[in-house]
Amino acid sequence: MASFISFLLLAALIGMASWQAIAAEPSPLQDFCVADLNSAVRVNGFACKNPTNVSADDFFKAAMLDKPRDTAVNKVGSNITLINVMEIPGLNTLGISIVRVDYAPLGLNPPHTHPRATEIFTVLEGTLYVGFVTSNPDNKLFSKVLNKGDVFVFPKGLIHFQFNLDPHKPAIATSAISSQNPGIITIANAVFRSNPPISDDILAKAFQVDKKIIDLLQA
């Protein structure tokens, strides 16, 4: 009887170890897996392109990340250039993307989250106020004023933002992001501009404001 119980315990431990082993993305079993963006195969990511058809262009993009972007394209005064697997298919399975962010004077990259990635953020020009908020129940704000050359980390999945403090000069930053397809959820857009819209009754109760204010925000 004792040996049978020991066997059951051993089987349970092996099962737990196996579950933990498959919980993370496996290590690469080949040099690369260039995304076949036209493949009909649906997997968690993209199917691999036939390696005999891979060229150097699959790992390259003339992104001109050294060139300033137009920050008047939206009302918040920022322009984001994301280079991910959709831009460079060779990034598939490699777990990294790069971003350039341009800020107008007093420009904002509004509160948002990357559900699949951590971000390491570097200021190239200007002075930015940045921060992130922890999960419930604390909702603690960690914030910092960054100058040229400073680096800040935004943990995976947490809401974060950047704001150009200078009313006269633009700012520039770049980020490395720990996913080839990090995703982005802009909080205001997700809540007030979902498709179809979230009921104004729900939002009015959630934010404890009059429905007229919600209707205005959703307009």
From Swiss-Prot:
Gene3D superfamilies: Jelly Rolls (2.60.120.10)
GO cellular component: apoplast
Binding residues for Mn(2+): 112, 114, 119, 160
Family annotation (PROSITE patterns): GERMIN
Domain Cupin type-1: 63-215
Keyword field contains Glycoprotein: yes
Signal peptide (UniProt feature, chain positions): 1-23
InterPro entries linked: Cupin_1, Germin, Germin_Mn-BS, RmlC-like_jellyroll, RmlC_Cupin_sf
Pfam family, one: Cupin_1
Domain of life: Eukaryota
Disulfide-linked positions: 33-48
Keywords tagged on the record: Apoplast, Disulfide bond, Glycoprotein, Manganese, Metal-binding, Secreted, Signal
UniProt KW Manganese keyword: yes
Localization: Secreted, Extracellular space, Apoplast
Glycosylation sites: 53, 79
MF terms in GO: manganese ion binding
Function, in words: Plays a role in broad-spectrum disease resistance. Probably has no oxalate oxidase activity even if the active site is conserved.
UniProt similarity note: Belongs to the germin family.
Complex and partners: Oligomer (believed to be a pentamer but probably hexamer).
Remaining remarks: Member of the 12 germin-like protein gene cluster located on chromosome 8 in the major-effect quantitative trait loci (QTL) for fungal blast resistance. Partial suppression of the 12 germin-like protein genes increases susceptibility to the fungal pathogens causing rice blast and sheath blight diseases.
Name by which UniProt lists this protein: Putative germin-like protein 8-1
Annotated source species: Oryza sativa subsp. japonica
